[in-house]
UniProtKB/Swiss-Prot annotation:
Gene3D superfamilies (alphabetical): 3.30.420.100
Feature: compositional bias, Basic residues: 9-27
Signal peptide: none
The species this protein was found in: Prochlorococcus marinus (strain MIT 9211)
Gene this chain is encoded by: rplR
Pfam families: Ribosomal_L18p
Gene Ontology cellular-component annotations: cytosolic large ribosomal subunit
Protein name: Large ribosomal subunit protein uL18
Subunit structure: Part of the 50S ribosomal subunit; part of the 5S rRNA/L5/L18/L25 subcomplex. Contacts the 5S and 23S rRNAs.
Organism placement in taxonomy: Bacteria, Bacillati, Cyanobacteriota, Cyanophyceae, Synechococcales
Length: 122
C-alpha cells in the first residue's frame, strides 16, 4: 500500500473530524485553514450553512499591523484575537473548534490560544 502525502493525511484527518463536529447557531464551528503563507479562520453556522464572521492574515486590519509574515505564530495569534473580537461583537461566546485536519501544534495552537484569551470559550 502506498504511503499518503502530508496533504492527503491532513484531508483524511479532516474528514474523520468533521463526522463528529457540527456547528449550530448557539454554538457555531470555528474552522481553521492553514496554508504555507497564511492562516484563515471562520465562525460557521452549519445549520444555516452560513459564515458568521471570519479573519485571516490577508485582512486589511491585520496587514498593516503585522511585522512578521502571514505564516508565523505571531500572525496566527493576531488572527485569533481579531476573530474573537468579531465573534463577540456578534454575540457569540461559545464555539466548537475545528482544526481542519491540522495537528494542534504551532500556528493552529497559537490561533486557538489567542482566541481563548480574547474571550471565546471552547
Amino acid at each position: 500500500m502506498a504511503t499518503l502525502s502530508k496533504k492527503q493525511q491532513t484531508q483524511k484527518r479532516h474528514k474523520r473530524l468533521r463526522r463528529h463536529l457540527n456547528g449550530t447557531n448557539h454554538r457555531p464551528r470555528l474552522a481553521v485553514f492553514r496554508s504555507n503563507n497564511h492562516i484563515y479562520a471562520q465562525v460557521i453556522d452549519d445549520e444555516a450553512q452560513s459564515t458568521i464572521c471570519s479573519a485571516s492574515t490577508l485582512d486589511k486590519d491585520l496587514r498593516e499591523k503585522l511585522k512578521a509574515s502571514g505564516g508565523s505564530c505571531d500572525a496566527s495569534m493576531a488572527v485569533g484575537a481579531l476573530l474573537a473580537q468579531r465573534a463577540l461583537a456578534k454575540g457569540i461566546e461559545q464555539v466548537v473548534f475545528d482544526r481542519g485536519g491540522n495537528l494542534y501544534h504551532g500556528r493552529v495552537k497559537a490561533l486557538a490560544k489567542s482566541a481563548r484569551e480574547a474571550g471565546l470559550k471552547f
